[in-house]
Amino acid sequence: MYSLSLPTWNIHIVTLVEWSIVIRLIYLFTYFYDIPRSFNFLIIILMIFFFLSGLFACCWHFFNNNSILLWISVAQAALTAFSNFFFLLFISAYYHK
């Protein structure tokens, strides 16, 4: 747990809290402004993948970057790449209309 400084841990934890708040706010925004449910579902699913990626990064650092848990780092990188690709695909399809 000592692989990161306290301010860096603060940034990691605050980012996870921020993602969870934004997921909830997007849900409420699409609910109150009658935005299509498909938009709501897709954007929240993608944001959950980003959130999981950050959670994996925190777990990796919490255990001092242990080489036994290398799969966590690989999963975090895969989730980030997956999320970035599909977020770009989703945004381009949404604005292509």
Swiss-Prot record:
Its main location: plastid. It is found in: Plastid, Chloroplast membrane. One of its GO terms (cellular component) is chloroplast membrane. Keywords: Chloroplast, Membrane, Plastid, Transmembrane, Transmembrane helix. It comes from the Eukaryota. The chain crosses the membrane at residues 13-33, 43-63, 71-91. It is a multi-pass membrane protein. InterPro entries: Uncharacterised_Ycf49. Belongs to the ycf49 family. This is Uncharacterized protein ycf49. The lineage of its organism: Eukaryota, Rhodophyta, Bangiophyceae, Cyanidiales, Cyanidiaceae. The gene is ycf49.
